Design a protein with these regions (language model features):
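Short Gly/Pro-enriched turn/cap motifs at secondary-structure boundaries
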Residues: 7, 18-19, 51-57, 108-112, ...
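Glycine-rich beta-strand-centered segment in the early N-terminal region that forms part
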Residues: 20-34, 47-92, 131-133
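Cytochrome P450 core scaffold surrounding the K-helix E-X-X-R motif
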Residues: 39-43
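Short glycine-centered segments of the SAM/dcSAM-binding site in methyltransferase folds
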Residues: 79, 162, 253-254
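NAD(P)H dinucleotide-binding glycine-rich loop of Rossmann-like/cofactor-binding domains
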Residues: 88-166
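Mid-domain Rossmann-like dinucleotide-binding core that forms the NAD(H)/NADP(H) cofactor-binding site
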Residues: 134-214, 218, 233
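Glycine-rich cofactor phosphate-binding loops and adjacent beta1-alpha1 units
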Residues: 155, 198, 203-272
Length: 272
């Protein structure tokens, strides 16, 4: 099969590789769509992988073409999306249902071969069926959509507040839409790209602000009557936006870092 293989830092090659074999409890998926996550960029450009060679890709959709022994909930022909986290299911955190806190986890497309290939094999529980009327392109967005809603749920989210979304990427757009769905006084998306901000408006943002423009902070605070934002979601994983999150926050606000930073982050005592 063909695959996009990361063979070294800054070196991705389109190669012919051996097809993965189905094992008990696993399913083989013919990949239709596989997204490039922001976290994949440092994996390719900044020595961010665990080993070479590796096939990235953890946001994907496709068709089940083969099932292993013992598989009962997924069948050949099912249209599925992939859930990439592979918790150990044995540690204290897993036993409490806190799978994202597992310290012994694996991850499809990072610690295991991923979906930037013709086929990928995953555990049955990580293949999530979706309806025939859902396009494969949308099915591949399952993972970032759940990342966003997890961040919202972890912050005791409630409506009636001003909400700031820092970063207009995929996860930022989903976070904006979830907070709109669950109710908000006004949701404002912040980014440095006018193109992304225009998309945010089309997808439902009440206001958008380009943080490269002079006076953006005054404009942002004016929207809230000077009180700040009750919920601030940082989704870009960048040091400047993580600092900005606290500047925008109202008293007793919820500040959530969904984005993953790849540089050292420090705060002054005054900022904290």
């Amino acid at each position: 099969m063909k695959a996009a293989v990361v063979v070294a830092n800054e070196d991705v090659q389109y190669q012919e590789v051996e097809e993965p074999q189905v094992t008990p409890g696993h399913v083989k998926i013919k990949v239709r769509y596989s997204g490039i996550c922001g976290s994949d960029i440092p994996r390719v450009l900044n020595h961010g992988v665990h080993f070479y060679p590796i096939v990235l890709g953890h946001e994907f959709s496709g068709d089940v073409v083969e099932v292993g022994e013992g598989v009962t909930k997924v069948k050949v022909g099912d249209r599925v999306s992939g859930a990439p986290l592979l918790p150990c299911m044995k540690c204290d955190d897993c036993q409490k249902g806190n799978y994202s806190l597992c310290k012994h986890y694996s991850f499809i497309g990072s610690r295991e071969q991923g979906a930037n290939a013709d086929y990928v094999v995953v555990p049955e529980k990580n293949a999530v069926p979706f309806a025939d009327n859902v396009p494969y392109e949308q099915g591949a967005m399952f993972e970032p959509a759940t990342v966003a809603i997890h961040g919202v749920f972890q912050n005791d989210y409630h409506g009636g507040e001003y909400v700031a979304i820092l970063g207009g990427g995929t996860v930022g757009m989903f976070t904006m839409q979830w907070t709109k769905i669950f109710g908000s006084k006004k949701v404002v998306v912040f980014d440095i790209s006018d193109e992304r901000l225009a998309l945010a408006k089309r997808l439902g943002a009440d206001e958008v602000i380009n943080t490269k423009e002079e006076g953006y902070m005054e404009k942002a605070m004016a929207i809230t009557g000077g009180k700040g934002y009750g919920f601030v979601f940082e989704t870009a994983g960048q040091v400047p936006t993580m600092h900005m999150a606290f500047e925008l926050a109202a008293n007793k606000a919820h500040v959530c870092f969904i984005g993953t930073p790849h540089e050292n982050l420090t705060f002054t005592p005054k900022q904290w």
